[in-house]
Amino acid sequence: MALRRSMGWPGLRPLLLAGLASLLLPGSAAAGLKLMGAPVKMTVSQGQPVKLNCSVEGMEDPDIHWMKDGTVVQNASQVSISISEHSWIGLLSLKSVERSDAGLYWCQVKDGEETKISQSVWLTVEGVPFFTVEPKDLAVPPNAPFQLSCEAVGPPEPVTIYWWRGLTKVGGPAPSPSVLNVTGVTQRTEFSCEARNIKGLATSRPAIVRLQAPPAAPFNTTVTTISSYNASVAWVPGADGLALLHSCTVQVAHAPGEWEALAVVVPVPPFTCLLRNLAPATNYSLRVRCANALGPSPYGDWVPFQTKGLAPARAPQNFHAIRTDSGLILEWEEVIPEDPGEGPLGPYKLSWVQENGTQDELMVEGTRANLTDWDPQKDLILRVCASNAIGDGPWSQPLVVSSHDHAGRQGPPHSRTSWVPVVLGVLTALITAAALALILLRKRRKETRFGQAFDSVMARGEPAVHFRAARSFNRERPERIEATLDSLGISDELKEKLEDVLIPEQQFTLGRMLGKGEFGSVREAQLKQEDGSFVKVAVKMLKADIIASSDIEEFLREAACMKEFDHPHVAKLVGVSLRSRAKGRLPIPMVILPFMKHGDLHAFLLASRIGENPFNLPLQTLVRFMVDIACGMEYLSSRNFIHRDLAARNCMLAEDMTVCVADFGLSRKIYSGDYYRQGCASKLPVKWLALESLADNLYTVHSDVWAFGVTMWEIMTRGQTPYAGIENAEIYNYLIGGNRLKQPPECMEEVYDLMYQCWSADPKQRPSFTCLRMELENILGHLSVLSTSQDPLYINIERAEQPTESGSPEVHCGERSSSEAGDGSGVGAVGGIPSDSRYIFSPGGLSESPGQLEQQPESPLNENQRLLLLQQGLLPHSSC
């Protein structure tokens, strides 16, 4: 099929733009496909009509389809005209072309199983410039410089840009795209850009530049809840002055305008504050102001409030009873308030019980009461407490008036103490202990004579003991596990996610404790696999006293999150199990993870610097740690996961020195958009949070990049604490002031430059994890090239049978100047290694290869030697 110019057909008006294609099908004069003419490129002005045609020969009734950029043309007039029995013309009409009509056109027809297509026509639509970028509205401080951008395209090109400030031209001509630099404005101003080409001009939307200002005063300040020592405050912020509010100050005083007022600065939002350590029963007044980057607002109105008082703190003392002919007189000492906040005392409350029946409490003024409505023939139990408007104080010790007591006065309980119950209790305990000891002794003697008792039976070849199966059961039946999951009270969605990773408790054995935290612990375990072998794993479990279903669900959600991961540098879930407990208590959930021999990266870095046996980590090893973490985070970000808690402490170090990103307790999956906003209070790692997370509780992949920069700093400093000496509450102001973590000693400029890019105030200016991984791999490759150019490092390890005077094997290292040592100083990691062999270690891997080292069976690598080889790159190391 080919396109050619058409001179028109009878009955058709001349075409503004046309092409003709011929297709010779089987049965025509020419067999097969015959192309005529050449491809056509056509240019028309916007709004003009266009007609295209193609001819088909050798087919009686062809079904002609017009295509544009690979898609069937729908919204256009299409006509097929018969010229002869086997010749047809296909017409495509566009009444008024727009820019969207530009593209590559051709026609096609189906001949049996084969589709014939014509040569194509490239249609170009020219018109006035079209804006792809228009200047945007801005809010800026007074006299602060800013930029506006404008971009327009043709065809036809070139496109020239002119800038207008109101009705005044302030820039141009300039080629598109164009940026207007404005030194500053002092009032609301409109800007626009004008794009011109040979077809005409177009004007952009006006961009309104407004002036930022300090915010307006807050209003509707309310004290929402009040207790004796605390008060919660909420307020509505005033107009923000077109700048983000970053903090509010709550000023508290005993009286409005008092000089010694307490000021509490809180980050916002939310616009609430909890005031602590207030005095009970005290009058206070408070007011609030908020601040943005241009300064604070005026204070709002003073709001008075009073904290609640305290209930009495002491129980009445010397509570006693006196029998009389008319009744029972009760007396006690007056309760004197210990704290001024307790307030004035009200009546005393008298409680009395007779024959297991509790009577109504009596309200008594003063410290004396006469009880007449009681039965002297029955035992009586009495208590008394002080009360005030806030509540009741503690009750006194119970006073028992016996029906057999005919004394004229019932004194305080301590004056009638009886030693009989005490003596009986001690005797009972001694007798019980003696009986238990006797039983255990007799049982032990029977066990030691077990062999003698069954000698005759064993000699006859008969079994000494016969067993009968009481019942049969299956330990791994899913019904039991399902019932246990149901008892946890977790959501059906979470339960469904965990069903295929549940492991029966009987399939693994818990071992030693690896670590313990505030909410749980991690223990070593042996997991039995399907082939009967055992593999070492780590088991993470909640504390036994955490019984809330919400805590259990949050714990198991981390496991469900890890289930989706499959990457060498992201911790992978092995399974989930439930530890049964007696007496109907909730089972303890356990998350089973791969065993990481070297623990978390932060602890490993600390041990290399300040451990009992410090060792040096070469720069290549530190950069390799960063590459591994970047690989893992690149994988997570590609799956729309944000970690929210990336730090060295949450990265695990495997036996082969590869790093895995772990601890997904705070991670979230993003289902729409590219951000997650924290909606409830959680414990968050402030010193690893990005600016937008601190200010707006906003978390994206860009905030994870910020945390990765802090993690890089941790690695380069070998586990130091970031922002040492700066409190968490001061971090935001420290960062918003432009401050960042300083370059660590011995840190390469290229590495610190990457860190600094991660801490850009604009999240979109931070590099992606893919970019970070590639840059770090380049740095690592450069370090490897440098290290291979250095001399090999020789380490002579004496035989273990020849200890030094200190009693430990001696290590001799070949002497080199500091300029030659380079990063090969990592030999400190093998100080004091007992061995009877001689090894040559090369930081660059130029001496012996790993295979050569492994060919010495008489001198296997011990743990410290293996660690050094991994650091120097002489053993395999997984990569992403």
Swiss-Prot record:
<dbReference type="GO" id="GO:0005635">
    <property type="term" value="C:nuclear envelope"/>
</dbReference>
<dbReference type="GO" id="GO:0051649">
    <property type="term" value="P:establishment of localization in cell"/>
</dbReference>
<feature type="modified residue" description="Phosphotyrosine; by autocatalysis">
    <location>
        <position position="794"/>
    </location>
</feature>
<feature type="domain" description="Fibronectin type-III 1">
    <location>
        <begin position="217"/>
        <end position="310"/>
    </location>
</feature>
<feature type="topological domain" description="Extracellular">
    <location>
        <begin position="31"/>
        <end position="419"/>
    </location>
</feature>
<dbReference type="GO" id="GO:0050728">
    <property type="term" value="P:negative regulation of inflammatory response"/>
</dbReference>
<keyword id="KW-0829">Tyrosine-protein kinase</keyword>
<dbReference type="GO" id="GO:0070050">
    <property type="term" value="P:neuron cellular homeostasis"/>
</dbReference>
<feature type="glycosylation site" description="N-linked (GlcNAc...) asparagine">
    <location>
        <position position="75"/>
    </location>
</feature>
<comment type="similarity">
    <text>Belongs to the protein kinase superfamily. Tyr protein kinase family. AXL/UFO subfamily.</text>
</comment>
<feature type="glycosylation site" description="N-linked (GlcNAc...) asparagine">
    <location>
        <position position="53"/>
    </location>
</feature>
<dbReference type="GO" id="GO:0004713">
    <property type="term" value="F:protein tyrosine kinase activity"/>
</dbReference>
<dbReference type="GO" id="GO:0060068">
    <property type="term" value="P:vagina development"/>
</dbReference>
<dbReference type="InterPro" id="IPR003598">
    <property type="entry name" value="Ig_sub2"/>
</dbReference>
<dbReference type="GO" id="GO:0007218">
    <property type="term" value="P:neuropeptide signaling pathway"/>
</dbReference>
<keyword id="KW-0547">Nucleotide-binding</keyword>
<dbReference type="GO" id="GO:0034446">
    <property type="term" value="P:substrate adhesion-dependent cell spreading"/>
</dbReference>
<dbReference type="GO" id="GO:0051250">
    <property type="term" value="P:negative regulation of lymphocyte activation"/>
</dbReference>
<dbReference type="GO" id="GO:0005886">
    <property type="term" value="C:plasma membrane"/>
</dbReference>
<dbReference type="GO" id="GO:0043548">
    <property type="term" value="F:phosphatidylinositol 3-kinase binding"/>
</dbReference>
<feature type="binding site">
    <location>
        <position position="540"/>
    </location>
    <ligand>
        <name>ATP</name>
    </ligand>
</feature>
<keyword id="KW-0597">Phosphoprotein</keyword>
<dbReference type="InterPro" id="IPR017441">
    <property type="entry name" value="Protein_kinase_ATP_BS"/>
</dbReference>
<feature type="topological domain" description="Cytoplasmic">
    <location>
        <begin position="441"/>
        <end position="880"/>
    </location>
</feature>
<dbReference type="InterPro" id="IPR000719">
    <property type="entry name" value="Prot_kinase_dom"/>
</dbReference>
<dbReference type="GO" id="GO:0001779">
    <property type="term" value="P:natural killer cell differentiation"/>
</dbReference>
<feature type="domain" description="Ig-like C2-type 1">
    <location>
        <begin position="31"/>
        <end position="118"/>
    </location>
</feature>
<keyword id="KW-0808">Transferase</keyword>
<keyword id="KW-0067">ATP-binding</keyword>
<feature type="modified residue" description="Phosphotyrosine; by autocatalysis">
    <location>
        <position position="676"/>
    </location>
</feature>
<dbReference type="GO" id="GO:0005789">
    <property type="term" value="C:endoplasmic reticulum membrane"/>
</dbReference>
<feature type="transmembrane region" description="Helical">
    <location>
        <begin position="420"/>
        <end position="440"/>
    </location>
</feature>
<feature type="disulfide bond">
    <location>
        <begin position="150"/>
        <end position="193"/>
    </location>
</feature>
<dbReference type="InterPro" id="IPR011009">
    <property type="entry name" value="Kinase-like_dom_sf"/>
</dbReference>
<feature type="active site" description="Proton acceptor">
    <location>
        <position position="645"/>
    </location>
</feature>
<keyword id="KW-1015">Disulfide bond</keyword>
<feature type="glycosylation site" description="N-linked (GlcNAc...) asparagine">
    <location>
        <position position="283"/>
    </location>
</feature>
<dbReference type="GO" id="GO:0005524">
    <property type="term" value="F:ATP binding"/>
</dbReference>
<feature type="region of interest" description="Disordered">
    <location>
        <begin position="800"/>
        <end position="864"/>
    </location>
</feature>
<feature type="domain" description="Ig-like C2-type 2">
    <location>
        <begin position="129"/>
        <end position="209"/>
    </location>
</feature>
<feature type="modified residue" description="Phosphotyrosine; by autocatalysis">
    <location>
        <position position="675"/>
    </location>
</feature>
<dbReference type="InterPro" id="IPR013783">
    <property type="entry name" value="Ig-like_fold"/>
</dbReference>
